[in-house]
């Protein structure tokens, strides 16, 4: 992908470099936690740069999540250029990039955030939710020391929790409202009907993708959010953060879950299944 530099603007610790003509915008960020100020007015987050910086501040200041000292945001103008960007900027295999571009509008990777900003997409609440969700993935990967190590359902569910919390801080939504919507949304989910969540499959990236393509993207993400929300309510947000940090020391998803939360994945699956069956009645 060719890139033409058209400008450079210093925003605090952030340098914005725009590339146009290729449908690709590149925004390098440098994060100094001491200089971050968490915004409270969503009306100030009108550009890609302002949104990423403001939401990063909420993650760091309000939620205590670490962000890498530097990372790059890639913004693409449509599905085809997004697919090419996944291959050339994020080193995703062409087959996987083609699959992801069919449904994903954002991807968080190791010190990278890739966004499909289709021309018809409004930059409102859901746009901010998307960015916050993917920034949470960037933070998780930084803590774990690599991609795809932690339980995928927990990575997705925690990212939704973080995104909804960010929207709440901005006065755009509440976690309680999203919890209620998710509870209603999973009432007829296949996993609940079958009384089998199958966290072993939901725990790896490929399995999670297969499940949400088969069972529906929205209810699968709602299920992941409710499971993560249950774990956060039970054990605390800091414990979940510690779980992701544990992968920097040991790459054993089952042992890390057991040592962090005091039970096996199978035991948690039965516990959270019982909880979900109760709340959806």
Predicted regions and their residues:
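Generic hydrophobic alpha-helical membrane-segment signal
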Residues: 7, 121-125, 217, 224
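Bacterial N-terminal signal peptides that target proteins for export
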Residues: 1-9
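Compositionally biased, intrinsically disordered low-complexity regions enriched in proline and serine
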Residues: 4, 75-77, 83, 255, ...
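Hydrophobic alpha-helical membrane segments, chiefly transmembrane helices and signal peptide h-regions
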Residues: 12-15
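Acidic/His/Gly-enriched intrinsically disordered linker/tail segments
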Residues: 105, 146-281
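Bacterial signal peptide processing site
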Residues: 21-23
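Juxtacatalytic substrate-recognition/specificity segment
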Residues: 25-151, 253
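C-terminal motif of bacterial Sec signal peptides marking the signal peptidase cleavage site
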Residues: 17-19
């Amino acid at each position: 992908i060719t890139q033409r530099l058209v400008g450079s603007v210093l925003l605090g610790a952030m340098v914005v470099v725009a590339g146009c003509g290729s449908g690709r915008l590149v925004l390098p960020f440098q994060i100094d936690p001491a200089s971050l100020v968490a915004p409270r007015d969503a009306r100030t987050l009108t550009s890609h740069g302002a949104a990423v910086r403001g939401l990063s501040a909420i993650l760091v200041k309000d939620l205590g999540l670490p962000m890498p000292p530097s990372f790059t945001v890639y913004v693409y103008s449509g599905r085809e250029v997004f697919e090419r960007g996944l291959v050339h900027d994020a080193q995703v295999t062409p087959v996987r990039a083609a699959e992801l571009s069919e449904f994903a509008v954002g991807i968080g990777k190791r010190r990278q955030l890739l966004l499909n900003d289709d021309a018809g997409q409004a930059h409102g609440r859901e746009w901010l939710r998307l960015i916050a969700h993917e920034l949470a993935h960037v933070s998780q990967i930084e803590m774990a020391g690599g991609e795809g190590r932690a339980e995928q359902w927990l990575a997705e569910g925690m990212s939704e929790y973080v995104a909804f919390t960010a929207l709440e801080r901005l006065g755009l939504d509440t976690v309680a409202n999203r919890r209620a919507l998710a509870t209603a949304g999973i009432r007829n989910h296949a996993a609940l009907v079958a009384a089998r969540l199958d966290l072993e499959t939901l725990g790896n990236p490929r399995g999670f993708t297969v499940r949400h393509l088969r069972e529906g993207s929205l209810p699968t993400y709602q299920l992941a959010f409710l499971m993560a929300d249950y774990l956060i309510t039970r054990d605390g947000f800091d414990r979940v953060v510690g779980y992701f940090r544990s992968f920097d020391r040991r790459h054993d998803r089952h042992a890390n879950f057991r040592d962090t939360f005091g039970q096996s994945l199978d035991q948690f699956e039965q516990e959270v299944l019982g909880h979900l069956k109760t709340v959806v009645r």
